[in-house]
Design a protein with these regions (language model features):
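Short amphipathic alpha-helical segments that mediate assembly, nucleic-acid/protein binding
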Residues: 18, 76, 112-115
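Acidic, proline/glycine-rich low-complexity IDRs
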Residues: 81-123
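Short, flexible beta-strand-to-coil junctions
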Residues: 8-12, 70-76, 98-100
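Ordered hydrophobic segments in well-structured contexts
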Residues: 2-6, 46-48, 57-59, 66-68, ...
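Hydrophobic side chains in well-ordered alpha-helices
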Residues: 17, 79-82
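Short, intrinsically disordered low-complexity segments
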Residues: 26-73
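Short, extreme N-terminal segment that most often corresponds to the first beta-strand
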Residues: 1-31, 122-123
């Protein structure tokens, strides 16, 4: 399933620090492969990795305000928390799945357990 962590509203030119996000992903999944070949607006930077649940992939929108995650929910929650930590506190961030079965605001300081509870309550 695909999940998204996306800035809601105007990001005022802000975009995620790609290097910091790459460092976090490679820190969790040491064998992660990074593909920086710009393939499309949605797939400007791609990370492929092996999780405990199987293969996973994350890719970044070229403006740096949306992270797409093709992973199991627990890995998507971890990635969304990392994305939130790298996002300015004054920007609103939403975490959802591709079918909008749930759509939750991801506040600064939210933990993985709290986000899991929000997702379970919304879904």
């Amino acid at each position: 399933m695909t999940f998204l962590a996306v800035v809601e509203g105007d990001a005022s030119g802000w975009g995620i620090d790609r290097e910091a996000l790459t460092d976090a992903i490679c820190g969790r999944w040491s064998g992660a492969e990074v593909d920086s070949l710009h393939r499309s607006e949605v797939r400007s930077l791609i990370w492929q990795f092996e999780t405990e649940n199987g293969p996973g992939e994350a890719y970044l929108h070229e403006d740096g305000t949306c992270l797409y995650m093709d992973v199991w929910q627990e890995d998507a929650i971890w990635l969304a928390i990392v994305f939130r930590r790298l996002t300015p506190m004054d920007l609103d961030l939403v975490f959802c799945d591709e079918g909008y079965n749930f759509d939750v605001r991801l506040q600064a300081g939210t933990t993985e357990a709290e986000l899991t509870d929000l997702v379970n309550a919304a879904g």
